[in-house]
Swiss-Prot record:
Pathway: Purine metabolism; IMP biosynthesis via de novo pathway; 5-amino-1-(5-phospho-D-ribosyl)imidazole from N(2)-formyl-N(1)-(5-phospho-D-ribosyl)glycinamide: step 1/2
Subcellular location: Cytoplasm
Bridged cysteine pairs (disulfide): none
Top-rank taxon: Eukaryota
Name used for this protein in its record: Phosphoribosylformylglycinamidine synthase
Organism: Schizosaccharomyces pombe (strain 972 / ATCC 24843)
GO terms (BP aspect): 'de novo' IMP biosynthetic process; negative regulation of TORC1 signaling; purine nucleotide biosynthetic process
Domain Glutamine amidotransferase type-1: 1062-1306
Top-level class of the enzyme under EC nomenclature: ligase
Catalytic activity, as annotated: N(2)-formyl-N(1)-(5-phospho-beta-D-ribosyl)glycinamide + L-glutamine + ATP + H2O = 2-formamido-N(1)-(5-O-phospho-beta-D-ribosyl)acetamidine + L-glutamate + ADP + phosphate + H(+)
Active site (record annotation): 1156 (nucleophile), 1284, 1286
GO cellular component: cytoplasm; Golgi apparatus; vacuolar membrane
């Protein structure tokens, strides 16, 4: 094993954070990476020879005097995602002697002299993640990192229950195994297993293996089998006719139309719109008209996120993406969402008056840590895989609530909710799994087995604190999204064939292949014979049980016909995606797993034992009535007499995380990848995160103006008062959000219902039944909508001992509703952005009150902010009123009367109107005379309703439409938008102002929570600058200042008789190929799919192309530096290097475009690009965070005229999207910078909204020197840029464009010109 130290592992910000967290025990620290390179025994590799891939290697030792050395490295027995990718790079780059590379961090720590043992332990805990890392005071030994132990053998569990053995003793032994392995088996299931091993002829002659028992525990866990939802219920002594699941299925039974597949697969499939399949056919990107069906799914990953937030949330999103990719014969995730519920944040120095700190179990993360780390984990997976995340929610809650006996208990989210969901697309002919032919090869596709995620299905089925700490840690997985992207590329290659070779596919999730492989063949009515050692596995010491049951991520199981196996293998090899043919299906319905290494049979079971009918669960529940107090809407009971009640309420409500800006959760995510996003969370010229709905475009294709919408709704605090009302309001809120998009009709909406509960907690089982009944048997059938998909998590409580006292926190019943619908007009997506008087004339604000004057405050944000629950909560009281409102809204979408729309929800009418003003940077004046005389109740109740902005000239028509639908009494003309720059927000009654402030002040308060989180997590200076920008009333926002007419095609006057070939170049991990291919395809090129394996193998030569386009994404997961692995694989491969050298240097008819990861590639290939020696490298953003934003770019007037891409765009400035973590332009030397400026290679740069070159964040999102965003070669034929023009080629894909351009620009926006210009140059 070679050991070398590397560069600094601590940024200024991260060092500061650690010192702040360890202030009581540490006075100083520094850190560098250290690399452990495991090589073949006779290898001659050394520091110098490894530097091309590990550029920061140092031969000297890192051990400063007077410090204590602390070494952090991946947990023994595990392989980090970093190691997998780094080793992959080394092998691709020709380092055949490298077996594995691992990386750790060496800290040199100066501890304070008086540090106690407890302080030392606390300080060390801040240096590593116990779930994924180990800590030592010396460098790890080779055997500790590079496990060379012999494989562990099979274990048999001695039940002694066969041949007339004692069943009671066997039951006791199995109970012991149940606790030891964390199987979460119920007593009746233990009895069932004992009976099976007693009476089943093929089993009673032997003892069960640990593999069999562990598999049974996973397959039959609550997580996988949903026992509570399938149980028989008796409530208050009355036996119920329906199971919970039967009530949910009732919605589909009553309304099956428009749903293609429900309850039978990893996601539900819905009828979509007409569109196209745009995909490579024999390598050529081609477009084919066909229906585009879409699918929906929402998962939760609560337990892992509580234990270790980053990997827990990352694998939550990753698992849900796999669900969407493994429907029928194969599918594809298209856009995602993420939601979080946690207890109070308790931000240091920013504690809010409603917050509680009741402690937590030692090994569970705090709510603050969860919200600092989990969203990064989820976003990182989405970003790297290449799925835009365009919707979500965030709620905090922790409160003392009375029990039925009047004593108090804590209700909150110590067991957090981490929701991950989304929509995908599927070809109609692939919506159902095909029958698997007997004898078909069964394949595991994706990453290898790893010693992670053991028992996750069972662990998540237990209330937190019931299992052991070590079992909790063992049950959490780790994510490798770049591997999952490779697997998805294999699936895509199969599904775009005329005849898909995949017969059936399942994702590997809870229980690992022990659940997925049996399920795959069982669904087909078959058995199977598997060989354990054919399952890809890179940790040799793993036992049979660990290989079979581990939840290693990024895996799928599938079947193909024998005659298609070679084709499938060739696809995998092209994509460098691991796979294993692990067995074959059999007619006999028996599951057999052999182990040729030990010549054993770890599993030999009839399928009916595994999937048979263990005893059905029966649940008995009692209704619990708790004493409730009416909320004092005057607030006098909660405030000092001198307080201003409305001002106090405003400031509390705007700071509540459920209301406050979610910017810190949004800009960390890529919301533009694919180029098919028509509506993300950020709204308008000032990009304020207030959108109600996320919308995707159906597909690329001429004239396509349709899409798919998704939105969420949840009202969990109300469930503490009325579970039925909470459920109805969650459905209603979701629909109110969804109709901001133009949906065809109410009956096209389909829902996912995700149920979180602690049904064993007093009263909670009855509440769960009440809520399911309210929407399953009553509301949804009445609305004509259904719930064809969903999930449940039935262990939402946390228990622990602290100082000898037992503590517990139990979540309220939490129903998360996600709605999905086709969209029939992408140009009629309403946002909350109020339009300015100067742009459209005088307007009115109309409030539609669907509660007909009721103003119940129970369960509201206002009540929570005063630590109150209330006694009466909002409800959907009048179904006809609600349906008529939706009918009016769908009709209004066919007009141009509505200028802005926002539903009323968390925070009430005050928040609805304020957010609309924030988004529009306008002032508003509102009058409450037509509402209840209780001002606070009128402003902060959360009854159903919405606000619309209507031009005064259109008011009569809009009011007439509401009247025609019986809604006249619901409509209130309550305000107007003010002209000018004053931007005041005021509310009055009877001519007297009851509240007045400024947009900038309220906007600042609303953004404060996000700012505080960014200040802790990211570069605090960047967070401060973004906060300060809010106060600028004169900020004109994003704008289009064009020197060209987008309607005029620069190729129109050319006689284009051919489509020259452009290589759409990608490497493993690249995810931005679709939008790049379309941009060139739409501009008159033949776009050709070229993987680096095509070039390295010699199958493809660049001589055949006039252009290359290196796409964005995460080649090799950005390990060893963004673009570095990709570039090094070219530079160190003689044939590939020559291919690129010839393309760049020996031909004058070529051009090249590198975007994002492709830009980073070009900058590292600058030695091959003529005149590019002075180009900068692109490194970590100054914000220390991934940045997904819409920003302003300017094309330099002089330099722009010298580039073939921008000659007709020179001098223009316009918005574009950025999506990168490493985009800051840094020069190798000052002389390079001077040469670069002298030659005028600075082509594109960031400007602020005043059209000025800027270093200020977030206008310059990465801190690039001179705001550099894109560079050109001296000849003008090669362009490298970090922003993504290809993602906003479609006009509707721009997060903001002027309303006046909706019809003027046609299908494409201004950035199509960049690609058309290349086509013009080719001629």
């Amino acid at each position: 094993m070679l050991v070398y130290y590397g560069g600094s592992a601590l940024s200024v910000q991260s060092k500061k954070k650690i010192l702040e967290l360890t202030v009581s025990g540490v006075s100083d620290l520094n850190a560098v990476y250290f690399y452990l390179i495991y090589t073949k025994s006779n290898s001659s590799l050394n520091c110098e020879s490894l530097r091309p891939i590990l550029s920061d290697l140092q031969e000297s030792e890192f051990k400063p005097d007077g410090t204590t050395m602390v070494y952090v490295f991946p947990r023994p027995g595990t392989i980090s995602p970093w190691s997998s990718k780094a080793t992959n790079i080394a092998n691709v780059c020709g380092y055949k002697d490298v077996i594995r590379i691992e990386r750790g961090i060496a800290y040199s720590v100066v501890f304070k002299d008086d540090i106690s043992e407890e302080m030392l332990k606390s300080a060390l805990n801040h240096l590593y993640d116990r779930m994924t890392e180990a800590l030592r005071f010396k460098l790890p030994e080779e055997d500790e990192v590079f496990d060379k132990h012999e494989p562990a053998p099979l274990v048999r569990i001695e039940l002694n229950c066969g041949q007339g053995g004692d069943k009671q003793a066997a039951t006791e032994r199995l109970n012991h195994a149940n606790k030891k392995f964390g199987l979460a088996l119920a007593p009746d299931e233990i009895d069932y297993l004992v009976e099976c091993y007693t009476s089943e002829p093929s089993l009673k002659s032997r003892e069960p293996t640990d593999v069999e028992l562990f598999m049974f525990g996973q397959v039959n866990s609550e997580h996988c089998r949903h026992k509570i939802f399938n149980a028989d219920w008796t409530i208050d002594g009355e036996k119920k006719d329906y199971s919970l699941f039967k009530m949910i299925r009732n919605t589909h039974l009553k309304n099956p139309q428009y749903t293609i597949s429900a309850y039978s697969d990893n996601a539900a499939v819905f009828e979509g719109n007409s569109g196209t399949l745009f995909a490579p056919v024999n390598g050529i990107w081609s477009m084919k008209d066909e229906p585009v069906e879409f699918l929906g799914k929402v998962e939760t990953h609560n337990h892992p996120t509580a234990v270790s937030p980053f990997p827990g949330a990352a694998t939550g999103s990753g698992g849900e993406i796999r669900d969407e990719g493994a429907v029928g014969q194969g599918s594809l995730s298209k856009a995602g969402l993420a939601g979080y519920s946690v207890s109070d944040l308790n931000i240091p120095g920013y504690k809010q008056p409603w917050e509680l700190d009741v402690g937590k179990p030692y090994h569970i993360a705090t709510s603050l840590d969860i919200m600092l780390e989990a969203p990064i984990g989820s976003s990182a997976f989405n970003n790297e895989f290449g799925r835009p995340c365009i919707n979500g929610y965030f709620r905090t809650f922790c409160m003392e609530v009375p029990r039925g006996d009047g004593t108090l208990e804590i209700r909150g989210y110590h067991k957090p909710i981490m929701a991950a969901g989304g929509i995908g697309r599927i070809r109609k002919q692939h919506a159902f799994k095909k029958s698997i032919a007997p004898g078909s090869p069964i394949i595991v596709l994706g990453g290898p087995a790893l010693l992670v995620g053991l028992g996750g299905g069972a662990a998540s089925s237990m209330n937190a604190g019931e299992g052991s700490e070590e079992l909790d840690f063992a049950s959490v997985q780790r994510g490798n999204p770049e591997m999952q992207r490779r697997a998805q590329m294999v699936i895509d290659a199969c599904t775009t064939m005329d005849e898909n070779i995949i017969q059936s596919i399942h994702d590997v999730g809870a229980g690992g292949v022990s659940n997925a492989l049996p399920e795959l063949v069982h669904d087909a009515g078959l058995g199977a014979r598997f060989e354990l050692r054919d399952i890809p596995c890179i940790e040799p010491s793993m036992s049979p049980m660990q290989i079979w049951c581990c939840e290693s991520q990024e895996r799928y199981v599938l079947s193909v016909k024998s005659e298609d196996l070679d084709t499938f293998k060739s696809i995998c090899e092209r994509e460098r995606c691991p796979y294993g043919v692990v067995g074959y299906s059999t007619v006999e319905q028996r599951l057999i797993l052999t182990d040729r290494l030990y010549n054993t049979t770890p599993i030999d079971l009839p399928m009916e034992v595994l999937f048979g009918k263990p005893p059905k669960m029966s649940r008995v529940a009692e209704t619990q009535t708790i004493p409730l107090s009416k909320f004092d809407s005057s607030l006098k009971s909660y405030l000092a007499p001198s307080s201003d009640p409305i001002l106090d309420a405003v400031e509390r409500v705007l700071r509540m995380p459920a209301v406050a800006s979610k910017s810190f959760l949004i800009t960390i995510g890529d919301r533009s990848v694919t180029g098919l996003i028509a509506r993300d969370q950020m709204v308008g010229p000032w990009q304020v995160p207030v959108a109600d709905v996320g919308v995707t475009v159906t597909s690329y294709g001429k004239g396509i103006n349709t899409g798919e919408a998704l939105a969420m709704g949840e009202k969990p605090i109300s469930a503490l008062v009325s579970a039925a009302a909470s459920a109805r309001m969650a459905v209603a809120e979701c629909i109110m959000n969804l109709v901001a998009a133009s949906i065809p009709a109410l009956d096209r909406i389909r829902l996912s219902a995700n149920w979180m509960a602690a049904p064993s907690h007093p009263g909670e089982g009855a509440k769960l039944y009440e809520a399911v009944q309210a929407i399953g048997l009553e509301l949804c059938p009445s609305l004509g909508i259904s719930i064809p998909v969903g999930k449940d998590s039935m262990s939402m409580s946390m228990k622990w001992n602290e100082d000898g006292r037992e503590k517990s926190v139990t979540a309220p019943l939490s129903l998360i509703i996600t709605g999905f619908s086709p969209v029939d007009d992408l140009y009629s997506i309403w946002t909350p952005q109020l339009r300015k008087v100067e742009d459209i004339g005088s307007t009115s604000l109309i409030f539609i009150d669907l509660a007909n004057g009721k103003q119940r405050l129970g369960g509201s944000i206002l009540a929570q902010s005063y630590k109150q629950l209330g006694d009466e909560v909002p409800d959907l009281d009048n179904l006809d009123t609600f349906k008529n409102f939706i009918n009016v809204i769908t009709q209004l979408h066919k007009t141009n009367y509505i200028q802005a729309y926002h539903d009323k929800s968390d925070g009430g009418l005050f928040v609805t109107l304020s957010e609309m003003a924030f988004a529009g940077h306008v002032g508003i004046e509102c009058e409450l005379d037509s509402l209840s005389s209780d001002n606070i109740a009128a402003l902060f109740n959360e009854e159903l309703g919405a606000v619309i902005q209507v031009c005064d000239r259109d008011i009569a028509k809009v009011l007439e439409l509401f009247a025609a639908n019986g809604l006249s009494t619901c409509v209130h003309r309550i305000g107007k938008v003010l002209s000018g720059q004053a931007q005041t927000i005021s509310f009055s009654r009877s001519g007297k102002i009851i509240f007045k402030s400024t947009r900038s002040k309220l906007h600042g308060i609303w953004h404060e929570t996000s700012y505080k989180m960014q200040e802790i997590r990211d570069n605090p200076e960047c967070a401060r600058q973004e906060m300060e920008n809010i106060a600028d009333n004169n900020d004109p926002g994003l704008g289009y200042h064009l020197t060209f007419d987008p309607n005029v095609s620069v190729t129109a006057d050319l006689a284009l008789t051919s489509r020259p070939k452009v290589a759409i170049l990608r490497e493993q991990g690249v995810n931005g190929y679709l939008e790049m291919a379309y941009a060139f395809y739409a501009s008159g090129f033949t776009a050709v799919d070229v993987h680096m394996t095509d070039i390295l193998s010699g199958r493809v030569h660049l001589d055949d192309f006039v252009g290359i386009a290196a796409c964005g994404g995460f080649s090799y997961g950005d390990v060893l530096g963004s673009g570095n692995g990709w570039a090094t694989s070219i530079l160190l491969h003689e044939d590939a290097r020559n291919e690129f050298y010839r393309f760049f240097n020996e031909r004058k008819d070529t051009f090249g475009l590198g975007i994002c990861n492709g830009c980073q590639l070009f900058s590292r290939l600058k030695s091959l690009i003529p005149g590019a020696k002075s180009w900068p490298m692109f490194t970590f953003n100054e914000s220390a965070q991934y940045e997904g934003r819409a920003v302003m770019l300017k094309i330099d007037e002089t330099s722009g005229s010298k580039s073939i891409f921008t000659e007709s765009m020179a001098g223009s400035s316009l918005p574009v999207v950025v999506a990168h973590g490493e985009g800051r332009a840094v020069f190798d030397s000052e002389s390079d910078y001077e040469q670069f400026k002298k030659e005028g290679l600075d082509l594109i740069y960031y400007v602020n909204n005043y059209n000025e070159r800027t270093s200020r964040y977030p206008f310059n999102p990465n801190g690039s020197r001179d705001a550099i965003a894109g560079v050109r070669s001296p000849c003008g034929r090669f362009l490298a840029m970090m922003p993504h023009p290809e993602r906003v080629v479609l006009k509707v894909a721009n997060s903001y464009y002027p309303h006046s351009k909706a019809s003027e620009w046609g299908v494409h926006g201004p950035w199509i010109r960049l690609f058309q210009s290349a086509r013009k140059w080719v001629g």
